[in-house]
């Protein structure tokens, strides 16, 4: 009798647990249930810009490998600047492919979802194609041959692609940027902190110059770059006031910028500081080095952990 009751209890709880475990969690957001409205597309796209800021907010891949910088007032030069990269400290492309994955999601579902305004749909798709081209151009210049992934990864049943030749990667960059140019409904700017048709022409110009010089594109690529450069300059002009170039107001010289809100930069005491991983902090002097300067109010300086690890090189200043 006791054994029978025990068996019944075990069966009851086992079946109950099974039913509980089989319940589909209604609060879980996945690709299967997220993409429904145009707000889902535009909201997701805004999040991509956040990831883009993190990916390019570094000197590691570009300036550190060139001759633009020299040592600044404080230590902290990267291993890339010191030409001391090894298998243990070298960077990787995970963050960039994560960014590409998000763009692939917007492109896939943005094409499926209906928008009340066709221009808004085209602009969202254009921005996604622009960011994907921008990211692949970054990868191409850093690693050369890289895998080309044009579909989002929505299953663990995938085959990892091999690295594609640089010429093929460049073709994909230009395909994306040309499609972005076609899709943008405006010829000018809606928001200079987001991609636009002039920004797409500027990216195309940069890519064509790389193709001409590094990938043996020759005069044909240079000629196409000249045409694209003229189109990129529509609506912008040189500012007679040099200081305005560094203003947060996106002046008349700006074609594309990434937005950083000052309120993001607070220490634990609530004091406004510049985060040490902000791009500009590597070039600015610490406040303690300029506090006694007669023109301290005219000097851009950093607080807290930020420091001027770099200074413009003599070669750069001689330009």
Predicted regions located by residue number:
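Conserved, well-structured interaction surfaces
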Residues: 42-44, 50-52, 73-143, 158-168, ...
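Membrane-proximal, proline-rich intrinsically disordered regions
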Residues: 17-61
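Elongated scaffold/linker segments in the mid-to-C-terminal portions of large proteins
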Residues: 78, 234-319
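Short coil/turn linking the two alpha-helices of tandem helical-hairpin repeats
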Residues: 140-142, 147, 188, 210-219
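Bacterial Sec-dependent N-terminal signal peptides
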Residues: 1-26
